[in-house]
Amino acid sequence: MSHAVSRLRDERLARSTKPFIARGSRAPRCPDCRVISSYCLCAWRPAVTAESGMCLLMYDTEPLKPTNTGWLIADVIKDTHAFGWSRIDVDEQLLALLDDPQWQPYIVFPGEFVAEERVVNKVSRMDGKRPLFILLDATWTEARKMFRKSPYLERFPVLTLEPEQISRYRLRRSRRDDHFCTAEVAALCLELAGDTCASGVLCVQRSLSGCQVPQADRPRRRGPHSFEGFYLKAFYHAVLRICPVWANCHPCYRATTLRA
């Protein structure tokens, strides 16, 4: 099933003049979920409801990277929009989205680089509008450039994540550093907006999507004790704790329970 990030990747591929080689590009991947083919998650794609929307502004080659986590966001959050960033040629559809009266855009960026009056730490429903989180999907150096050179974003509040929230999230992840991927930032934003079920499912999706990378070159064993079996069961039980109603309604997860 196509979504905004996959369509943006297709558009970027059409403009490419040579193969894009990056970390993870040698492994054969499912064209839809972008997970290594042996562990395709298409049948397990979450379908949770969320009031929030996501707007991914992606630096030039980000959609081409096999390890880009914008795919996970689009898999979980239905209202995910993705645009390639350009300093000069701004996408008209992006501007129309930012002007859509149903949305209250927030640009997610560290507050120390922004005028104090623009910084907010909470997500408020202004006039009943739904929150739209603008995420700069790029390296840190590229993201700073995007922030400085995008004047059309200057009218929006800058959402800065609180140290307490970052600390709570760090306890749930294996790496102990201050660098978060795009999907992890999105999960924190969803939590702030009250979309806790979507936030939790995205956390699980992100954590487990990284598990299959070191296993990719090993022979695949089938059966209940295979890595695939542990992978899917772990995914199910994690989602069940976060969002039991959705998990029990999903046929794939019910089947996993019966096999467990």
Model-derived regions, located:
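Short, intrinsically disordered C-terminal tails of secreted or membrane-associated proteins
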Residues: R254-R259
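Short cysteine-rich clusters marking metal-coordination/redox-active sites
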Residues: C30-C33
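Cysteine-centered motifs
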Residues: C243, C249-C252
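S-adenosyl-L-methionine/SAH cofactor-binding core of RNA-modifying enzymes
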Residues: K78-R148
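Residues immediately within or flanking Cys/His clusters that coordinate Zn2+
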Residues: A27, S37
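Short cysteine/histidine-rich zinc-coordinating motifs and their immediately flanking basic loops
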Residues: L41-L56
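Short Cys/His-rich Zn2+-coordinating modules
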Residues: R7-R23
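C-terminal folded domains that constitute the principal catalytic or ligand-binding module
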Residues: L132, W140-V239, W246
